[in-house]
Amino acid sequence: MKRPVLIGITGGTGSGKSTVAKEIYNKFDEACIAMIEQDSYYKDQSSIPFEERCKKNYDHPDAFDNELLINHLKNLVDLNVIEKPIYDFEAHNRKEETIKVEPRDIIIVEGILVLQDPKVRELLDIKIYVDTDADVRIIRRLLRDINERGRTVDSVINQYLTVVRPMHMQFIEPSKRYADIIIPEGGHNRVAVDMMVANIKHLLQK
């Protein structure tokens, strides 16, 4: 097995980056592709009371255990199996169990700050930024956090105004300049997704 092709997919919250990642994932046989979500690498907070965990800024680079993420990506590149963490968004902490991820020809790394850390960037063969209007992103985040993460409307809006938007402007938006490809309209941009799939297939043939 050759060195895996690592693809980084980033963008603001609700931009459609997960949709783009899934669209690309579904174009390949499951035996040759794996998905690594940056959200899985939020730091372990077992020593912090739940009330304090609820107040943490989860859109800041310091919220992520990038050391572990980088270690796992390097292991996959070296064709080693990893144990990917599982994050519980309602408890704001890692679960005890993990998911075994085996090396594949293609590794997708998806998350809001994938291009922010230079040590992560240097491991990526293709860097994608999914660009979507802010009003669309906040609506998507609102629906997701209420339906999937047990949040209230007020808490989501307050978090967006005080944390999410400032962090987007400070860390996520500036990382756009490191992207090889900028995809507008998220997962609905079929032309861009098809172009990326063709490019990945070309890299695999080298």
UniProtKB/Swiss-Prot annotation:
UniProt keywords (A-Z) are: ATP-binding, Cytoplasm, Kinase, Nucleotide-binding, Transferase
Q: Where do the annotations place ATP binding?
A: 11-18
- Gene Ontology cellular component terms for the protein in this record: cytoplasm
- Molecular-function annotations in GO: ATP binding; cytidine kinase activity; uridine kinase activity
UniProt-listed GO biological process terms: CTP salvage; UMP salvage
Q: What is its EC number?
A: 2.7.1.48
Give the EC class as a word: transferase
Q: Which reaction does it catalyse?
A: uridine + ATP = UMP + ADP + H(+); cytidine + ATP = CMP + ADP + H(+)
Instruction: Give the matching InterPro entries.
Output: P-loop_NTPase, PRK/URK, Uridine_kinase, Uridine_kinase-like
Pathway field of the UniProt record reads: Pyrimidine metabolism; CTP biosynthesis via salvage pathway; CTP from cytidine: step 1/3; Pyrimidine metabolism; UMP biosynthesis via salvage pathway; UMP from uridine: step 1/1
| UniProt cross-references to Gene3D superfamilies, sorted A to Z | P-loop containing nucleotide triphosphate hydrolases (3.40.50.300)
The record's annotation in SUPFAM superfamilies points to:
P-loop containing nucleoside triphosphate hydrolases
User: Superkingdom of this entry's organism?
Assistant: Bacteria
Locations listed in the record:
Cytoplasm
What protein family is recorded?
Belongs to the uridine kinase family.
Q: What is this protein called?
A: Uridine kinase
Q: Which organism is it from?
A: Clostridium botulinum (strain Okra / Type B1)
